[in-house]
């Protein structure tokens, strides 16, 4: 009987303890801690990968050193001063819709048009510092690190831009060409490809350069409203 009585009292005490805890929880419910990562909205942006024909290459009667800046608006017509060249139309069009860009990876590849008997070599290199001057000779381009020298008659390997996770501002070709200082250019570009084309006995198409890239955009650009005519134009 004594053991039964102690067991009954124990059950009653445990029941009172559980009930007291339940009342305390109801009176002071736990407050969930805020999770800043969970509540933060996802960044507005997108990542794109694409390959485009960047440049058709013709050999002339003089050596050529071409400069291809890696920027959001690669769309430089031949003859742009300074000697920027190359057009990635899709990249340039997409970049108009965003404020900033990250070049996750960029490479250029040589694709030949010439016959197996064609002699000569094309050299491609990458310069990441706009303070560095452009080489003036075909052989000088081949000494840059990283660089690649390929026989004109071969479908050659690629030259890859060193990894750079810097966030750059988006800019179009004409605006980039108008920048004066190296520091200004470095705000919009991780560097430039340099392509050296040897001279030939006559002008001839020798190949093309393909660009392959993966880029990430952030911050949708604010589109400018249509021009509102002034008082002098409203009735015309």
Swiss-Prot record:
A GO CC term assigned to this protein in UniProt: T=3 icosahedral viral capsid
Keywords for this protein: Capsid protein, RNA-binding, T=3 icosahedral capsid protein, Virion
Keyword Ribosomal protein: no
Pfam family, one: Viral_coat
Classification via SUPFAM superfamilies: Positive stranded ssRNA viruses
Start and end residues of each stretch annotated as S domain, virion shell: 52-217
UniProt-listed Gene3D superfamilies: 2.60.120.20
Stored InterPro entries: Capsid_prot_S-dom_vir, Viral_coat
Region of interest called P domain, projecting, as start-end residue ranges on this chain: 218-236
Sequence segments annotated as region (R domain, interaction with RNA): 1-51
Subcellular location: Virion
Region of interest (Disordered), residue spans: 1-46
Coiled coil feature spans: none
Residue ranges, compositional bias (Pro residues): 29-44
Protein role: Capsid protein self-assembles to form an icosahedral capsid with a T=3 symmetry, about 28-34 nm in diameter, and consisting of 180 capsid proteins.
Protein name: Capsid protein
């Amino acid at each position: 009987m004594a053991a039964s009585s102690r067991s009954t009292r124990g059950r009653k005490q445990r029941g009172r303890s559980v009930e007291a805890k339940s009342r305390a929880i109801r009176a002071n419910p736990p407050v969930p801690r805020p999770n800043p990562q969970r509540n933060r909205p996802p960044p507005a942006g997108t990542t794109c990968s694409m390959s485009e024909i960047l440049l058709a290459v013709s050999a002339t009667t003089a050596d050529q050193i071409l400069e291809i800046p890696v920027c959001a608006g690669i769309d430089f017509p031949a003859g742009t001063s300074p000697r920027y060249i190359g057009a990635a139309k899709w990249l340039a069009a997409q970049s108009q819709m965003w404020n900033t860009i990250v070049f996750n990876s960029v490479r250029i590849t040589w694709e030949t048009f010439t016959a197996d008997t064609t002699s000569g070599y094309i050299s491609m290199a990458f310069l990441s510092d706009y303070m560095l001057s452009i080489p003036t000779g075909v052989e000088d381009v081949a000494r840059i690190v990283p660089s690649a020298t390929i026989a004109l008659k071969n479908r050659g390997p690629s030259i890859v831009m060193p990894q750079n996770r810097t966030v750059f501002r988006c800019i179009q070709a004409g605006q980039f060409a108008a920048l004066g200082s190296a520091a200004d250019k470095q705000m919009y570009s991780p560097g430039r490809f340099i392509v050296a084309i040897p001279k030939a006995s006559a002008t001839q198409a020798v190949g093309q350069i393909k660009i392959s890239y993966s880029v990430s955009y952030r911050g949708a650009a604010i589109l400018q409203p249509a021009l509102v005519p002034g008082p002098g134009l409203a009735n015309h």
